Amino acid sequence: RIEDFAVESIWLNKMNSEDYEKLNNFFWFFSLDLKSSKKSTQSVISNWINNNNKYNKDSWEFDITAKRIIAWLSNHQLTYEDSEKEYRSIFNHMIQKQTNHLLNEIKNSNEVENKMIGCAAIILTGLAYKNKKVYLENGLNLLKNIIKSSIDNQGFPKSRNIKQLVFYLKYIIIIREWFKESQNIIPEYIDETIYYLGSSYAFIYQNINNDIFFNGNYLSDNQEFNQYLKRFGYTFKNEVKELAGYAILRNKKIILTMDIGSSPNKDFSKDYQAGALSFE
């Protein structure tokens, strides 16, 4: 219940780092019922602001801050609607203050996943505050750079990491849906990137309905993501047998998957585990 969190003392409790991150990134807002109390939800945010208005390295950590912006703005029906004028002023100020923090720090982030989440948060702020075009312009420039530097011409991460493929596809689709919801023109390169990433996703997952355990991948449950794609009308196809250094051969009884590609560049090899000619 949101009311259980609407007490100021919750932000002063000691907890382990995992619980601290979950509490402060506010992604738990996505599990709230839309019938939850707006007043209580806004009280939770007010209490957080009272205790975290000034920068501190823990609650303002880059990834936590980016997710918090996304959670606050995505749940605007609870976090913003029917609020008092003073609250709206403070809320708007804190969103922009946190977004400025992301813009200042994103160049120092070494994790491409964090950069993508930060980039998404900056874009969302730009779409939500139409009088602040600088956020949208900067966010889209960052997105272009991430796509250019991290995704190859076939629409596969240069790391050849399958988890990253799903991550990129998920966030770029989310960004596209924000453009639709805000009735802004969707940049053509976003549609193009989704097409190629989606084609790669169809090759890896949808054609075999199973995980392949190469290059840092693990057993995953993409059922929820597949339902998300279906809900918003995204369908992808790919009939090739080889892509991005992976080969998949199958008949009615057996699926043979092979990693026949080169090792990724050292800048993208953090999670690389299997060498060339690995089989499953």
Positions of PLM-derived features:
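A sequence-composition feature that detects small, non-aromatic residues
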Residues: 6, 66, 71, 120-121, ...
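Residue-level detector of functional hotspots within protein domains
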Residues: 14, 108, 142, 233-235, ...
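Aromatic-lined, polymer-binding surfaces characteristic
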Residues: 16-194
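Carbohydrate-active enzyme catalytic cores, enriched for enzymes
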Residues: 152-280
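Short glycine/proline-rich turn/loop motifs
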Residues: 9-11, 50-51
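Extreme N-terminal leader/anchor segments
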Residues: 1-10
